[in-house]
């Protein structure tokens, strides 16, 4: 980690993880609790409209930065990097992420206070943001829910992502893996 950052730069260091996920109108079945004698009735729809949430999390503090985009590409990733850079302008940031094409392209403009560090290939279990997506889908009214429009998906996603800002302790418990103590 020390080799990644400029030793002359005296700004404090923050480690973030980044990931993106799709949220849309297509629905699937998920387990749920119902009384023993009853059967769950869940509607289903096959409308393939999606939005993409890009999120960074600092597992040590539970701080997040998120954007919602209609596309998942280099431009959207650039917007997230710019927003994160502005929010933490007085910090050096090491952002750990997967090797998606929009993370590794030369067209991605990386702010001066951010250094990107790729995770090993095929290792989503190392990225704590994956737990955030599971939490949002399970606890923030995406499971077994049908949306009438993409605007309704966006409104629910905005609410869920804004709620995360008030749940830093929960985020720390979900995202601060024991091995992370060694990388700060």
Can you annotate each of these PLM segments?
Residues 1-184:
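Short functional hotspots at interaction and active-site rims
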């Amino acid at each position: 980690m020390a080799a990644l950052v400029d030793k002359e730069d005296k700004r404090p260091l923050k480690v973030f993880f980044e990931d993106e996920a799709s949220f849309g109108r297509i629905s699937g079945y998920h387990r749920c609790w119902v009384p023993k004698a009853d059967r769950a009735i869940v509607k289903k729809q096959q409308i393939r409209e999606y939005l993409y949430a890009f999120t960074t999390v600092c597992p040590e503090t539970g701080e997040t930065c998120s954007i919602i985009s209609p596309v998942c590409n280099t431009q959207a990733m650039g917007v997230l990097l710019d927003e994160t850079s502005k929010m933490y302008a007085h910090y050096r940031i090491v952002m750990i992420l997967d090797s998606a094409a929009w993370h590794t392209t030369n067209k991605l403009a990386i702010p001066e206070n951010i250094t990107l560090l790729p995770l090993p290939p095929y290792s989503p279990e190392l990225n704590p943001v994956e737990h955030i997506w599971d939490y949002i889908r399970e606890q923030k009214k995406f499971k077994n829910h049908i949306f009438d429009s993409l605007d309704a998906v966006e409104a629910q996603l905005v609410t869920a992502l804004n709620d995360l800002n008030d749940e830093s302790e929960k985020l720390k418990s979900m995202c601060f893996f024991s091995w992370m103590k060694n990388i700060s």
